[in-house]
Amino acid sequence: MKMKQRIYIDTSVVGGYFDDEFSTDTIPFFDRVRNGEIIVVLSDILEAELLRAPEFVKELLTTIPKEQIENIQLSPEASELADKYIEAKVVGKTSRADCQHIAIATLCKADVLVSWNFKHIVNLDRIRGYNGINYQLGYNMIEIRTPKEITRYGDED
């Protein structure tokens, strides 16, 4: 039996559920979570960002069974790693929360971080930058994908 994937999601994935451009791939992703195929890793950074979201967006996470959720906090080590990404100019200072998402996902050893943020996260140059810092500091590489890449197509073995 295959182990369930532990997938860290950022705020763009929650919002993508309700966005015409991204819902086609985001809704099936959340269906897989609800069906017990995926453990979704949620951070306190995501929770803080969702405080500014409309009520219906916040309520999406309440539709996920508790046993499919792993909650994780921003640790001092993750905060420091996020700062290292910024010091290395992988992204600018205004992208600190994005860096914190990546650092948390790296340190909790999530199987993959899923995002719709193409500017700061799901971007080949940025991914190489984050993983370059991870490698230099002795951390695991982080796999970064969109929900579309996590979707099952037809009957897979």
Cite the ranges covered by each PLM segment.
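Short, C-terminally biased terminal segments at protein or domain edges
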Residues: 138-157
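Active-site neighborhoods of divalent-metal-dependent phosphate/nucleic-acid chemistry enzymes
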Residues: 70-129, 151
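C-terminal end-helix/capping segment
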Residues: 126-143
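A structural signal for short, well-ordered beta-strand segments and their strand-loop junctions
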Residues: 8-9, 41-43, 113-115, 146
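A short helix-to-beta-strand connector/capping loop
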Residues: 36, 66-69, 137-142
